[in-house]
């Protein structure tokens, strides 16, 4: 009993022991989570990297594929946007998949439907132009602002507006939400770098380091 009474006092006298124990615990938890993520990525790899219904940019034959789950109303997605662009452009050997994952309300859903409709009707180059516009757009996203974007870019506004409500668009969003749920992704941005998943914003230099590590692992 006396030993039991003394243990709390010993911890108070040596708090670094508790700090070290917490550090070891957190590292083990992170390692276990990484293993679970890796197993899930392997199981779902075909769905993740086939990019059915998604825009694919960068080098289509790149040796590393980055997948981004994003939302146009997400502040951290907007912060990551120029850095992802810079990474892909400067590297030259990255395949980028953008998965529309609207989770921040009706404006997010509206923007995602618009972008997917453009991809389906006008093609990947048109999607990229719209994606760039939406990632930097100020103010609310509504039907009028989206119609103005489509008109400015020379697209068929009526066709795109009609397509936005098509089941083909709904299926893409539903598939991305289902995939995110299975991957335990519930926030944006979330990234997949080859066989590593990172939830949340990643600075440019950190992304470069992850890509380098993925290449080194082969």
Where are these regions (language model features)?
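C-terminal cap of thioredoxin/glutaredoxin-like
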Residues: 1-9, 17, 28, 148-218
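N-terminal targeting signals for export/organelle localization
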Residues: 1-44
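A short beta-strand-turn-helix
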Residues: 46-64, 88, 177
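Acidic/His-rich structured neighborhood in mature extracellular/periplasmic domains
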Residues: 47, 72-76
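Envelope-exposed proteins and targeting segments
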Residues: 62-65, 70, 92, 194
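Short pre-active-site segment immediately N-terminal to redox-active cysteine/selenocysteine motifs
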Residues: 70-73, 187
């Amino acid at each position: 009993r006396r030993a039991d009474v003394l243990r709390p006092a010993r911890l108070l006298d040596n708090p670094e022991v508790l700090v070290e124990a917490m550090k070891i615990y957190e590292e083990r938890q992170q390692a276990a989570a990484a293993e679970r993520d890796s197993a899930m990525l392997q199981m779902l790899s075909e769905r993740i990297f086939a990019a059915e219904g998604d825009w694919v940019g960068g080098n289509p034959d790149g040796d590393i594929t980055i997948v981004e789950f994003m939302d146009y109303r997400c502040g951290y997605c907007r912060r990551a946007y120029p850095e992802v662009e810079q990474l892909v452009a400067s590297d030259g050997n990255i395949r980028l998949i953008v998965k529309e994952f609207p989770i921040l309300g009706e404006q997010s859903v509206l923007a995602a439907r618009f972008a997917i409709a453009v991809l389906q009707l006008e093609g990947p180059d048109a999607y990229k132009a719209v994606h760039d516009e939406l990632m930097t757009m100020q103010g609310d996203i509504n039907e009028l602002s989206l119609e103005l974007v489509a008109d400015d870019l020379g697209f068929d506004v009526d066709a795109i507006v009609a397509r936005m409500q098509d089941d083909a668009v709904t299926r893409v969003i539903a598939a991305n939400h289902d995939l995110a749920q299975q991957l335990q992704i519930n926030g944006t941005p979330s990234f997949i770098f080859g066989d590593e998943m990172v939830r949340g914003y990643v600075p440019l230099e950190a992304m470069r380091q992850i890509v380098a590590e993925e290449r080194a692992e082969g």
